[in-house]
UniProtKB/Swiss-Prot annotation:
The active site is at residue 517. Belongs to the IlvD/Edd family. This is Dihydroxy-acid dehydratase. Homodimer. It is an enzyme of class 4 (lyase). The lineage of its organism: Bacteria, Pseudomonadati, Pseudomonadota, Gammaproteobacteria, Alteromonadales. GO terms for biological process: isoleucine biosynthetic process; L-valine biosynthetic process. Gene3D superfamilies: IlvD/EDD C-terminal domain-like. The gene is ilvD.
């Protein structure tokens, strides 16, 4: 029988000092011997997805203590990618993932916690906590802050739905009046919660359901809705159940590595492809798999991308549907249910919400169940009232959306596309692969041949796009923005948004060793591996080169001879210490970022740190 980890600091005369300190935190005599449950919160007033989380830890703690545990809360950092976008702040976003993972590990191991509740929400926080959870391998459950309501406003007497990307595009589009731009800005992000489309934050929170580590509704129930309160309370009760199963009954199915195993990672990626999730999820799943010692690679993602149809199309791939609409259609359980009926899912994997995924789907897939309580749960809708308060409204749709022919979630027969929403491309530009979010690419652009327009940084690319250097037919190449070369692998939402604002969104392609915001759409190809700073071919592309992109064939090619390519590589290597560095780029890089760059791997490895370099 496993012994409570916390016994290390609570048992024995030699731990009198530790017990004295525990007592100073409120632990009583009869509490010693109970499991200590760590609550990793991520409240901050900087981030709308986290601004409402201050009291969530207390909710979870109350449920834990009622169930017989000791709850101890701590906080992690949380970076808002949208606010950090377009300036040097974005260099810190991806590296913050490793800091979050490390901080959770440090707190949990330093204090010998027995189990963990992760209260996350936005882009790097859920992945960082997921990496830590699989690294620690103690009972864990995730509960996120929930998505923001979609923005709504009336322009030209027409009611339109909005999100963050609309504000960015309008702000850069000279054809949009100042008044309309301001109106869109004021309406785009009306409430607390993670941005309202299928961007990185919501994608990752959905994937925790598929991995088996969070409760149904975690990825889709609005932050403002009163029903979300129960998810926090149930998370507290469930973590005590998981801890009891493991520590009292030696049930290893309660551990995250046995829940989020290889089959579960396949399920998560299958969901991601079916819902056209953010391309950033590829980075985070690869990184998390490595932490859990799961042999899940780009090859697996490529294989799945050829099998899974696109069943759920959400902003930014369409203005029609946002996360509130996904929830009405049954949320993640609705998508997983359709994948299960298409025989594309492993339904025998463990899940924190039931004995296995099949059991959870039987109870929570609105197509399978007539349970009135479940249908009521998924009818929770938006109020349309600006607020930063959680659980502030109890509005409901008249009915759930179970139309699998023309609704937000489709069956395989009526899929938006039989091709999934993400694809892995490879070729001489990206020998180790790159990622494109096909859900956001117009069908006519699935094959594209253009002339390279090379920029050594995102800043130069933005200036070039806004300055008219980029024209229809160009392939914008932004390099030295990978994990090592940036450092930090910046998101390229501004370049793609500015291409749209200049009417080039469907007339140009963009490839980069950086990454894209979940809000990106268009022919935007990121995660090019190896990155330029690691000797990748993208570092050898020259302006005017012909680049051929073929999504159906999963290929991306620099159309020059092997002899010419080899000659360019030889010339680059001859530069010695100046090889594989951006020409003329002036960028202040802090010591913290330099330390990150020393260990950073390319995107095909999840941009994790290569600790073998420390040996």
């Amino acid at each position: 029988m496993p012994k409570l980890r916390s016994a290390t600091s609570t048992e024995g005369r030699n731990m009198a000092g530790a017990r004295a300190l525990w007592r100073a935190t409120g632990v009583k005599d009869n509490d010693f011997g109970k499991p200590i449950i760590a609550i990793a919160n991520s409240f901050t007033q900087f981030v709308p997805g986290h601004v409402h989380l201050k009291d969530m830890g207390s909710l979870v703690a109350g449920a834990i203590e009622e169930a017989g545990g000791i709850a101890k809360e701590f906080n992690t950092i949380a970076v808002d990618d949208g606010i950090a976008m377009g300036h040097g702040g974005m260099l810190y976003s991806l590296p913050s993932r490793e800091l979050i993972a490390d901080s959770v590990e440090y707190m949990v191991n330093a204090h010998c916690a027995d189990a963990l509740v992760c209260i996350s929400n936005c882009d790097k926080i859920t992945p960082g906590m997921l990496m830590a959870s699989l690294r620690l391998n103690i009972p864990v459950i995730f509960v996120s802050g929930g998505p923001m309501e979609a923005g709504k406003t009336k322009l030209s007497d027409q009611l339109i739905k909005l999100d963050l990307v609309d504000a960015m595009v309008a702000g850069a589009d000279s054809r949009v009046s100042d008044a309309d731009s301001e109106q869109i800005e004021r309406s785009a992000c009306p409430t607390c919660g993670s941005c309202s489309g299928m961007f990185t934050a919501n994608s990752m929170n959905c994937l925790t359901e598929a991995l088996g580590l969070s409760l149904p509704g975690n990825g889709s129930m609005l932050a403002t809705h009163a029903d979300r309160r129960e998810l926090f309370l149930e998370a507290g009760r469930r973590i005590m159940d998981l801890a009891t199963r493991y520590y009292q009954h030696d049930d290893e199915s309660a551990l995250p590595r046995n829940i989020a195993n290889f089959k579960a990672f396949e399920n998560a990626m299958t969901l991601d492809i079916a819902m056209g999730g953010s391309s950033n999820t590829v980075l985070h799943l690869l990184a998390s798999a490595q932490e859990g010692e799961v042999d899940f690679t780009m090859d697996d993602i490529d294989r799945l991308s050829r099998l899974v149809p696109h069943l759920c199309k959400v902003a930014p791939s369409t203005p029609k549907y946002h996360m509130e609409d996904v929830h009405r259609a049954g949320g993640v359980m609705g998508i997983l249910g359709e994948l299960d009926r298409a025989n594309l899912l492993h339904n025998d994997v463990y899940h924190v919400a039931g004995s296995n995924l099949a059991d959870v789907l039987a109870r929570f897939d609105i197509v399978q169940t007539d349970d009135a309580a479940v249908h009521k749960f998924f009818s929770a809708g938006p109020a349309g009232i600006p607020t930063t308060k959680a659980f502030s409204q109890d509005c409901r749709w008249d009915s759930v959306d179970n139309d699998r022919k023309e609704g937000c979630i489709r069956s395989r027969e009526f899929a938006f596309s039989q091709e999934g929403g993400l694809a892995v491309l490879s070729g001489n530009v990206a020998l180790d692969g790159c990622i494109v979010k096909t859900a956001g690419v117009e069908v006519e652009n699935h094959t594209f041949i253009g002339s390279a327009r090379v920029f050594e940084s995102q800043d130069d690319a933005v200036a070039g796009i806004l300055g008219g250097e980029v024209v229809a037919g160009d392939v914008v190449v932004i390099r030295y923005e990978g994990p090592k070369g940036g450092p930090g692998m910046q998101e390229m939402l501004y370049p793609t948004s500015y291409l749209k604002s200049r009417g080039l969104g469907t007339k140009c392609a963009l490839i980069t060793d950086g990454r894209f915001s979940g809000g990106t759409s268009g022919l935007s190809i990121g995660h090019v591996s190896p990155e330029a700073a690691a000797g990748g071919t993208i570092g050898l592309v020259q302006t005017g080169d012909r680049i051929e992109i073929d999504i159906p064939a999963r290929s991306i090619k620099l159309a020059i001879s092997d002899i010419e390519l080899a000659a360019r590589r030889t010339a680059m290597e001859a530069l010695g210490k100046d090889a594989w560095k951006p020409l003329g780029r002036v960028r202040q890089v802090s010591m913290a970022l330099k330390a990150y760059a020393l260990l950073a791997t390319s995107a095909d490895k999840g941009a994790v740190r290569d600790t073998s370099k420390l040996v």
